[in-house]
Design a protein with these regions (language model features):
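N-terminal targeting sequences that direct proteins away from the cytosol to non-cytosolic compartments
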Residues: 1-86, 93-103, 109-146
Length: 146
């Protein structure tokens, strides 16, 4: 079992210093980002006794305030690795002259921590992007099974 006082990554590990927590983001960039979506996984923390639904609602409100033209769907159920339930939101907003399409799925991995999977693209999502999203989420394995 990994030492919880160290941050582990492919190339090695480093101590997690007192007062710091892991909020890393893993970004996966395609060879052609104009045609294929970017993917990322972020780690976050719930605020107090916040539920998954509360977390998603808070994040949507924050994004509406920060991103011009941000529009989001109602949260919908989604599964990670076929077993862990979460909530997904489809959204779009403007970044300068570019429209950004985004899909996010949030999963509670403990009472305090969340994993946020994001797919974003300047192009509207098509059947290929939908298949990529489903395969990416379905392919998740918890650290103790990886």
């Amino acid at each position: 079992m990994p030492d919880p006082n160290r941050f582990h990554f492919d190339e090695g590990s480093t101590p997690l210093l007192p007062g710091y927590e892991d909020r890393t983001v893993n970004s996966f960039v395609p060879a052609d980002p104009q045609r294929e979506p970017n993917l990322s996984i972020a780690r976050d923390r719930f605020a107090g006794a916040e539920t998954l639904s509360d977390y998603v609602a808070r994040q949507v409100l924050l994004l509406k305030k920060k991103l011009p033209g941000y529009k989001a769907s109602a949260p919908a159920p989604v599964a990670l690795g076929g077993t862990l339930g979460g909530l997904a939101v489809e959204a779009s907003y403007r970044s300068g002259a570019t429209s950004v399409h985004q899909r996010q799925a949030v999963f509670a991995v403990s009472d305090e921590r969340a994993l946020v999977f994001t797919m974003s693209s300047p192009r509207a999502f098509d059947a290929a992007a939908d298949a990529l999203w489903r395969a990416w989420l379905a392919g998740f394995r918890p650290a103790d099974e990886a």
